[in-house]
């Protein structure tokens, strides 16, 4: 009896790139709904523009590289980058700001290195940091919750008309950084940006992204190592340097966990399988490094929220982390640590 020969591996996973990306997009829905409830249609406008621009840049570069458009566009990786970037940008951001951010994310953050699976940096965070440094006024103009009408927002995005004075307000992280003379209780009483534990409305947004992250964990699309490492490190750092609600306080552990882009970063950014560490121990170290850097930059740096900077800095360290945390090779007692000095 002739037995057929097949090439190994004989078992393969059921998750294709397209399916994984669709699951990630699905997991962002709770956060999108929370942001839309808080800021109105501005988040949806960002999502529509970012998706359009990201797909256009992706198609243009693929055409220039003479790659099949349909095959690569259908993996939805550009769409995931667009969604993460749109969620990080302020609602009702000008169209040209979204265009520049998407251009840097897709062209310089992804395609310049060869496309999906080759990028050393998280593309969405690279695009975000470029526009944050280049256009700080526009990037720090967050609208007050429930404070902008949909039509006025569209006019502002297109540059037809400006929004009324007072439409924007400082976020809780902004207020904490620039009002060091006030205690936490005084800030909470005087500033509507503060909620019970974190930023007003930001608590619900972070919990929504936490729900999406738990869905990804349930589907085994991510592991717990990087998110737990980041959140635990941020909690410990904020606990060590928390002195109550005095005027020199940097905020409580709950404040840091439920304010800004903490949960979005922990479950959707830090877990990037390409630009992060690859082993489980490496992912844990990577997440801890991000959490420490987030607190350091929030407390003593020049930017109120620091998830993007922390992730990009740890992207630089990811190869070194992989080098020292690589698992033991089969048949060897110790991990294969690569070359040694003197060899």
Curated annotation (Swiss-Prot):
InterPro entries for this protein: NqrB/RnfD, RnfD_bac
Keywords: Cell inner membrane, Cell membrane, Electron transport, Flavoprotein, FMN, Membrane, Phosphoprotein, Translocase, Transmembrane, Transmembrane helix, Transport
Residues recorded with modification FMN phosphoryl threonine: 171
Requisite cofactors: FMN
GO biological process: electron transport chain; transmembrane transport
Highest taxon in the source lineage: Bacteria
Membrane topology type: Multi-pass membrane protein
Class of enzymatic activity (EC top level): translocase
Localisation per UniProt entry: Cell inner membrane
Protein name per UniProt: Ion-translocating oxidoreductase complex subunit D
GO cellular component, one term: plasma membrane
Function in brief: Part of a membrane-bound complex that couples electron transfer with translocation of ions across the membrane.
Subunit-level organization: The complex is composed of six subunits: RnfA, RnfB, RnfC, RnfD, RnfE and RnfG.
UniProt similarity note: Belongs to the NqrB/RnfD family.
């Amino acid at each position: 009896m002739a037995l057929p020969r097949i090439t190994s591996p004989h078992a393969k996973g059921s998750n294709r790139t397209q399916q994984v990306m669709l699951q990630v997009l699905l997991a962002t829905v709770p956060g999108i709904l929370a942001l839309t409830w808080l800021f109105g249609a501005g988040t949806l406008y960002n999502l529509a523009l970012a998706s359009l621009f990201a797909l256009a840049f992706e198609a243009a570069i693929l055409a220039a590289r003479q790659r099949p458009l349909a095959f690569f566009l259908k993996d939805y990786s550009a769409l995931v980058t667009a969604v993460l970037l749109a969620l990080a940008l302020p609602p009702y951001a000008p169209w040209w700001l979204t265009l520049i951010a998407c251009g840097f994310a897709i062209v310089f953050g992804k395609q310049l290195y060869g496309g999906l699976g080759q990028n050393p940096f998280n593309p969405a965070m690279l695009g975000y940091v470029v526009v944050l440094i280049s256009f700080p006024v526009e990037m720090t103009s967050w609208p007050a919750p429930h404070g902008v009408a949909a039509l006025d927002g569209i006019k502002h995005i297109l540059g037809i008309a400006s929004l009324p004075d007072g439409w924007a307000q400082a976020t809780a992280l902004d207020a904490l950084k620039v009002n060091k003379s006030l205690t936490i209780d005084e800030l909470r009483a005087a500033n509507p940006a503060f909620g019970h534990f974190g930023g007003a409305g930001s608590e619900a947004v972070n919990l929504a992204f936490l729900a999406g992250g738990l869905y990804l964990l349930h589907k085994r699309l991510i592991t717990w190592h990087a998110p737990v490492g980041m959140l635990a490190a941020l909690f410990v750092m904020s606990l060590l340097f928390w002195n109550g609600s005095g005027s020199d306080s940097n905020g409580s552990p709950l404040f840091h966990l439920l304010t800004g882009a903490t949960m979005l970063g922990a479950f959707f950014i830090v877990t990037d399988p390409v630009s992060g560490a690859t082993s489980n121990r490496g992912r844990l170290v990577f997440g801890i490094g991000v959490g420490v850097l987030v607190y350091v930059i929030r407390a003593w740096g020049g930017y109120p929220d620091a998830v993007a900077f922390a992730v990009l800095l740890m992207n630089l360290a990811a190869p070194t982390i992989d080098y020292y945390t690589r698992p033991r090779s089969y048949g060897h007692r110790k991990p294969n640590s690569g070359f040694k000095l003197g060899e």
